[in-house]
Amino acid sequence: MRKIIGILSIFLAFAFMSQAQKIKVACVGNSVTYGYGIKNRETNCYPAQLQQMLGDAYEVENFGHSGATLLNKGYRPYTQQEAYQKALRFAGDYVIIHLGLNDTDPRAWPNYRDDFVRDYLSLIESFRKANPRCKVWVCRMTPVWTATHREKSNEIPLGNENCVSRKPTPVHLEK
């Protein structure tokens, strides 16, 4: 009888522990994710707003890095930033990726555009290695205003669509 009670106690303890674990959401990206230039960034960036909307059953973390590029040969590759390493260790159940805007920079896109889809798929795969059960959501590019040096931004959504066609779910951050 003691064995049965002991085993039942252990089973119940594990059942309660698994219910208490929060669903982890990793928000990965550039300054849009980080919240650069937003007043009260810690509470107004989109990952903080998402946390508020999802509630206590979720743990949403901001792994944005201002100026980050998706391209590994870009001028500030996301995969070389500490935010990336932290995001991998977090091993989110959901990974929302919003990268590509800084890749439209003339220092990157003209030279490395052919690497975009490959680098995106590699990034997605790295998160799947960290948590094989994770669901990856790829955000569409936020619009680029016309008074910018990023004239090739209209080409990036095509790259994102190629990544999306390989199983991640697209997410629209536009109005």
Descriptions of predicted regions:
Residues 51, 124-128:
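N-terminal cationic-hydrophobic initiation segments that often serve targeting/anchoring roles
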Residues 98, 139-140:
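Alpha/beta-hydrolase-fold catalytic nucleophile elbow
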Residues 130-136:
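A short helix->loop->beta-strand "cap" motif at the edges of active sites that frequently abuts
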Residues 1-21:
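Bacterial Sec-dependent N-terminal signal peptides
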Residues 22-27, 32-118, 145, 151-155:
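Conserved SGNH/GDSL esterase-like catalytic core that processes O-acyl groups on lipids
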Residues 143-175:
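Substrate-gating cap/lid alpha-helix
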Residues 84, 120-125, 157, 161:
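Generic structural signal for well-ordered alpha-helices
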Residues 59-61, 135, 169-172:
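Conserved beta-strand segments of alpha/beta enzyme cores
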